[in-house]
Every structure is written in structure tokens, then in C-alpha cells.
Amino acid sequence: MSKQEKTINLSESAQVDQQSVQPFPRSRKIYVEGSRPDIRVPMREISLHDTPTDFGGEANAPVLVYDTSGPYTDPDVIIDVRKGLADVRSAWIDARGDTERLGGLSSNFGQQRLNDAELAKLRFNHVRNPRRAKAGANVSQMHYARQGIITAEMEYVAIRENMKLQEARAAGLLKQQHAGHSFGANIPKEITAEFVREEIARGRAIIPANINHTELEPMIIGRNFLVKINGNIGNSALGSSIEEEVAKLTWGIRWGSDTVMDLSTGKHIHETREWIIRNSPVPIGTVPIYQALEKVGGVAEDLTWELFRDTLIEQAEQGVDYFTIHAGVLLRYVPLTAKRVTGIVSRGGSIMAKWCLAHHQENFLYTHFDEICEIMKAYDVSFSLGDGLRPGSIADANDAAQFGELETLGELTKIAWKHDVQCMIEGPGHVPMQLIKENMDKQLECCDEAPFYTLGPLTTDIAPGYDHITSGIGAAMIGWFGCAMLCYVTPKEHLGLPNKDDVKTGIITYKIAAHAADLAKGHPGAQIRDNALSKARFEFRWEDQFNLGLDPDTARAFHDETLPKESAKVAHFCSMCGPKFCSMKITQEVREYAANLRIDAVDVSVEEGMREQAERFRQEGSQLYHKV
């Protein structure tokens, strides 16, 4: 530990990132109560201005949007990262009566870290003794679902996915939604708790919800639900403090990360993870082989099953919700990568490939998979079966190594399901557009519709610095085809560690991709926000346009670069076309002209309307400001 690290006492000095706790403009946090008072599902309500009298003068109903920010954007909640978030799920877990509280940590490494006095100043001070399933019990959401039980978590996510859809319809927020094309998915008109239970029992969806992550606000991942996105954080050997990683977490969920993966490979991985989980309202995923490798000094050949098993228990007792495990990297697949342009690009995949070759033995994650399942179901940790042989360039897409591993992941999925363990499948990578659907179709076939979770895919390799765009294209496509969760890519991909701005850019890019996929699939209510923003745009309600967007700050800043005065926010034009060429203003005048002449078809006499409108502009001296 460095001299500086020794002097920092995080339990006294840690502070929340102030940018992450600011409420969004004209937004308030609301909570929708379920069948019991402690099921309180958060949503963000955006209030809108009335339509100006020029456009009919009507009130506009508030719009609800899915909210991943947890209590951080609730001004009524006092945030103290030193104490962590409030407990959400303990009462639900206690009521099921199938877990027990341990007397302390049971992993060897966890005990070592706890007994290391030098780490006291870095430690999160409010650690609870972990829970574990009672002997012979299975505490996974899949197990409950297959018993016909609707858990509080299932009810919670049904309310969250449905977003008060019936009320939105009654308020006129969904007068129009295009029919989607879902490629055989089973998307209902309304999400119910029973539908959630059925999807989890079938294996088509998962609720990542470790029994030791009780601060969690449950969410669901599956092709018949809203497309989710994941954001990555984590320190490295090159730096980053624990406080910085917690700040990355809160910043990421502010902008829409549905889950967060802690990919730390540097110092104090155990302590960093504790701070992250205790302050996270979203599921946390990890790649346990990274920490296991750190424990053997970075020498892959020295990894053992026993050490890896202890790492799984250590992380499960902290509350990690899903593990990426590269159990499909088999010895026979490694030679198939020899002629690739970019070889094996997955860190986890390369670690296991090196171990297999060094020992000339089969991957111990594969041979011990049943034992891993026993650990997973004792804590309800979900599998994210890693694609260690994913293509790292479009030249390598859809090759024998990639699809051979995918077939093995399908085999492992069925083993996990025999244990009633929740499971999703990781996917590529770098894939040109014409090969993306083949990836989705093959995954559905091999893995029997288990949720697919992809990194992009990147659709071209020629744009370093813009890979959030090259991958966002592929993400939107594969999300439409049936992918359940998209792992974000930042502009720094392949170039360096992302900063806060890069993280935000990556998340917003992927929120766009996910939402575009929801629209294309025809998810119920997906078009509500689009309709509201389009109406605000046509009525020149500038503030509502900003506030309904995914990133109000950037929208407002771009507008104000050229029209900074407050009066510009009631103007019936923007700087793109100016007052004389605003198509929407002209269209409104044409509508009025047609109405006055009692012309039924608005598109009749457009040319005459244009001439009359131009003359009116000249007479009014182009003064088009209106007070709201």
C-alpha cells in the first residue's frame, strides 16, 4: 500500500459524486406500490408545459420513464456512500425462510482481507454477515418460478416494465404506436407478474439478484422485455481509486446503465467491490477469473479449481449478482483460432486458453461446472456464460471457433437449468451487418432462447475513436433481432481507459440503440416518449424537448450555442432553418389555412398556403416570438 493510500480513511472521507445526485430538470421521482407496502418501484416523472394557445392550448400529461438511478436522484433521500444504500429486499428474503445468516465470511481470501489491519482505512465499515441457502435449499428466482411462486422481485419487475401503461393510454400518450416485428418473440400487450414468472421458469429471462445484494432494485433481462444495457467500471494496474470507481457507478446509472460490471484488475479488488455493491441499486457483474489471476501473480498456469472456487464464494458472499465464466473455451477449440486475424481477444478466454495449453487438460471451469452451479444456487448468482472466443475483428466473425464455443455454451445452459440456476449468454464482438442475424438465430437455436448479452457488435473496424458508433449500429440491429442486453462501448474502445464524458457518451449511445430496438420489436408503450417529444417539437416547446430527451444537458447546450437568450426558448424556429424556413411553423400555418377554408385534406393547396405564409412573414417583420 502506498504512503498516500495509508493516510486516506475512506470510512471518514468518501463523498458521493455531486453531479450524480442532481435531479433531472422538471422531473421527480415517484414510487409505484405493489401488493405489499415495501414493494415501491421507482420511476421518473417528467412534467410538461401546456400546449401554447397558437396550437390549441391544451394540458399535456406528464411522461413516465424507466429510472436506473436509484435513490441518488431523489432529493428526499440523504445519500452517504460511507453507509451504503438502504435495504430493499431483506424482508422479502426473510419471509421465504430458506436462507441462513452465517457467523462470518466463509471464503479463505475474504477472511484474510478482513484480518489485514493495513486495509482498515480502505474497508467499507458496515459489512453484514452474509446469507446462504439452508442445506438442501435452492434460492434462485428460477427455482421459485418453476415452483409456481411469484416472488416480490417478480412483481417488482412487472410493475417496472409496465410503466403504468394503462394510465398512459388513458391520458392519450399512446394514440399511435407502429406495429413491431419481433422475429418470433412473445411480447405481450401488458407485462404481468405471472408473465414474468413464466419467462423465468422457461429460462428466457433472468432477474440477477444475489441474496446478499439487498440494496438492489430488481430488474429483468430477456428478449420479451425492454432491451437493457450494461456499463463497465473497474480499476487497473495503471490506477483509479475506490472513490473514483463508486463515482463511475453513480454516474453510469444516472444516464441509464441497467447493470454494471466491475472489471477491476488492479489493487484492492475485494475492497473496491464491497464499496460498489453496497452503493449500487443495479445488479453488479464480475469476471471472477480476473481476481483469481491476481491471486497467483498473473501467472495463468498457476490457477487452480480450489482457488477459483474460493473466489466464487468470496464474491457471492459480497453480493455479486452475475458471474461471467468462460467455461466454453475448450482445449479442442483453441487451435481453431490460430489462423484468425486477431486471435483470442477476450481476456478471460486467453487466460483459460493458456491454462489449457500449459497443462494440456480440459478447461477446469467446464469440468467443474456442476460444482459451480451448486455455489450459484446457494446465493442466487446468475451465469453470464462468457464468449472467450468471440471475434475481435470482422474478418474473424462467425468462424468455427466462435460457433463451436456457442454450441458448448448451449450445452452448459441446459446443465445450469437442471440446477434451476439463471443463465444468460455472452456474444460478440466484431460482426458486419449482414452476419448479425445469423449470430442471433444461432444463439436462440443453441441456447434455447436463454437471454443473449452482446458487446456491440462493432460493424466495422475502421473507426478508432468512434467505436461507440460502429458498435451502436450493430447493437440496435441485434437488439431488434432478440438480444436482451447490450454491453456499452465508449469512444475510447481499443485506445485507452474511458473518463466520465466517455462513459456518458457510451451509455447514451447504447440507450438510443436499446430504445430503437424496443420500438422495432413493438414493446408495449415504447413509443410514448417519442410521441411526447415529437408533439413538443412541433409546438416549439423547447424546454419540454430538452427534458424529454435522453440527455437534456447536451440538448440544451447545443440549442444555446447559437440562441442563448431565454427568449429563444419560446421562439417558433431554431438556428438550423431560422424564422423564415422553419418547416414545422410553415406546416402549422398551412394547417390553419386548410382549416379556415374547411379543406378536409391538409395536404391540399400547399403551394398557395406557402405563398400566403411568406407574405405574412414579410408583413410581420419575421417577429415570431410568442410568450408561453
UniProtKB/Swiss-Prot annotation:
Cofactor binding comment, as recorded: Binds 1 [4Fe-4S] cluster per subunit. The cluster is coordinated with 3 cysteines and an exchangeable S-adenosyl-L-methionine.
Ranges annotated as biased composition (Polar residues): 7-22
Superkingdom assignment: Bacteria
Broad class of enzyme this protein falls into: lyase
Annotated EC: 4.1.99.17
Record's keyword terms, sorted: 4Fe-4S, Iron, Iron-sulfur, Lyase, Metal-binding, S-adenosyl-L-methionine, Thiamine biosynthesis, Zinc
Binding, substrate: N232, M261, Y290, H326, S346, R347, G348, D387, G388, L389, R390, E426, Y453
Pathway connected to this protein: Cofactor biosynthesis; thiamine diphosphate biosynthesis
UniProt binding sites for [4Fe-4S] cluster: C574, C577, C582
Name of one Pfam family that matches: ThiC-associated
Cofactors named for this entry: [4Fe-4S] cluster
Binding site for Zn(2+): H430, H494
Transmembrane parts of this sequence: none
InterPro entries per the UniProt record, alphabetical: ThiC, ThiC-associated_dom, ThiC/Bza_core_dom, ThiC/BzaA/B
Catalytic activity: 5-amino-1-(5-phospho-beta-D-ribosyl)imidazole + S-adenosyl-L-methionine = 4-amino-2-methyl-5-(phosphooxymethyl)pyrimidine + CO + 5'-deoxyadenosine + formate + L-methionine + 3 H(+)
GO molecular function per UniProt: 4 iron, 4 sulfur cluster binding; carbon-carbon lyase activity; zinc ion binding
Region described as Disordered: spans on this chain: 1-22
HAMAP family linked: ThiC (MF_00089)
Family that this chain belongs to: Belongs to the ThiC family.
Assembly and interaction partners: Homodimer.
Name used for this protein in its record: Phosphomethylpyrimidine synthase
Organism: Pseudomonas putida (strain W619)
Lineage: Bacteria, Pseudomonadati, Pseudomonadota, Gammaproteobacteria, Pseudomonadales
